[in-house]
Amino acid sequence: MKFFVGISGYAHKEWKGSFYPEKLPQREMLAYYAKHFSAVEINYTFRQLPSQSVVESWTQQVPASFRFVLKASQVVTHFKRLQNVKKETDDFLRIAAILKKRQGPVLFQLPPNFKKDVSRVAAFLTSIQGRAKAAFEFRHPSWFDDEVVDCLRRHKSALCVADSEDLPATDLVRTANWGYVRLRRERYTDKALRKWISAIRSRRWDEAYVFFKHEDSAAGPKLATRFLELARL
């Protein structure tokens, strides 16, 4: 299994002195980050679509083995809720495709008040088939059933598992040959991290994307580093 491990975002000036060198210019942060981690979850794409030149510059700062995971536009997931979003989705995937082999999955995080609608998700996944690997993070409890799992399996899309203090993780379920896990707590003991590593490996995915939460204290880079250390043991 190949682990792609990182943090939600990288351009955090609060990390200077704890993760980044104190005097590191912001323009050098991505290259420095990519020396330590194999993936990054880009959340600002939720609110704003980056330009072609910005995305091209990202690819020039990281190795070919690095992966960018883009969070889908809020227009698609929150405002229009996967309906009548052909233009917005096409525009988003066109930008994502600039990443080429460095393109990871696209994270579709649905709002907490968006209740189960399998036919809507199925129609949306059909519309993007073959253009992107999709991970879905459902935040209303009505989504967690066999019908939804079967839908994701048919479309070879991942059920994103998110773990936080407010909402502990559901079980890891294999719906594709790759998985997506968001570890959102500020603290994880070695015991907890080992448990996650074991659970992820038991799903026998080809690839596992694992992202830690951004904290001003730079807890995310520390936890991601420790996760990688334990995964190598």
Describe these PLM feature segments.
Residues 1-233:
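Residues lining hydrophobic/aromatic ligand-binding pockets adjacent to catalytic sites
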